[in-house]
Amino acid sequence: MLGSRAAGFARGLRAVALAWLPGWRGRSFALARAAGAPHGGDLQPPACPEPRGRQLSLSAAAVVDSAPRPLQPYLRLMRLDKPIGTWLLYLPCTWSIGLAAEPGCFPDWYMLSLFGTGAILMRGAGCTINDMWDQDYDKKVTRTANRPIAAGDISTFQSFVFLGGQLTLALGVLLCLNYYSIALGAGSLLLVITYPLMKRISYWPQLALGLTFNWGALLGWSAIKGSCDPSVCLPLYFSGVMWTLIYDTIYAHQDKRDDVLIGLKSTALRFGENTKPWLSGFSVAMLGALSLVGVNSGQTAPYYAALGAVGAHLTHQIYTLDIHRPEDCWNKFISNRTLGLIVFLGIVLGNLWKEKKTDKTKKGIENKIEN
């Protein structure tokens, strides 16, 4: 009896690892464009994804499927079975926390954990808000018709109560920070609420998503330092916005036909066949801003080496992109988690390298004094 329970528990842990841990073949998908429009919030895989993507979807969904049945619609409403959106929301936070670390030190693990929890909750809240706004649209699109609200699994009132619960928990996380960060974090709520409306009135909803999804680039630094340093935080925030414009425009090309039919707008429709030049421009702006971040924060060689890898990643991503093949757009889109992790790794190693340089400088000074 105990043996079977232990085996079941081990299988459950393995399912969680498949769904959430980076570096494993089971990379989960689905971005949630902060709120998840029919072409956003819950970024679903294309109609015919490659086998790899399909395996990832099943492994992530297994975590939700193992939950009590009455709970499952709520977990799907917050896209807990599709954690790629949480990663893309979380990574700019890690960049900021890493940059704020003391020279020669690793990032604050407590803050990384706290922001990870907040990312899960706020991404879920954003998806809930989006589905409440978009339930009439979702019913008309095959890909989104099975969302919990559109499918009738959860009523609008139930989703509203659930949203209140998520925001309450997120507030609890926010209250663990300093007063400056509490005020700064509260300021993002308006963006979270209004983003889903942007695709109705503007061809630039991806820009609104970028402003929303990268708020953590400001908040992470202030949580460590007590306030924002504009010389570091603003270019970091700008680089994140450019990054979002890149990956979300690529994703939007999967849904451009549906968007036209149901009257929604996106940068994919705005750029059309000129998408690659636009993405190239965003990439140059992103790398330029990250370079400025490095200069203003005194970064070292590993950081700039990581930027070189990011540049190569973006070049390959854009050069090989086929905007008319949904499966290719999907593969390019999900590769951006790797890109974000490269930036974070470069920040951590660059910061650790500062200690080595400082030690060498101190030894040099000591030798001069002795001589």
Curated annotation (Swiss-Prot):
Reactions this protein catalyses: an all-trans-polyprenyl diphosphate + 4-hydroxybenzoate = a 4-hydroxy-3-(all-trans-polyprenyl)benzoate + diphosphate; all-trans-decaprenyl diphosphate + 4-hydroxybenzoate = 4-hydroxy-3-(all-trans-decaprenyl)benzoate + diphosphate; all-trans-nonaprenyl diphosphate + 4-hydroxybenzoate = 4-hydroxy-3-(all-trans-nonaprenyl)benzoate + diphosphate
Consequence when changing A252V: In COQ10D1; loss of ubiquinone biosynthesis
UniProt-listed Enzyme Commission number(s): 2.5.1.39
Mitochondrial matrix face residues: 35-83, 130-148, 194-203, 253-277, 322-332
Biological process per Gene Ontology, one example term: glycerol metabolic process
Recorded GO CC terms: extrinsic component of mitochondrial inner membrane; mitochondrial inner membrane; mitochondrion
Protein name as it appears in the record: 4-hydroxybenzoate polyprenyltransferase, mitochondrial
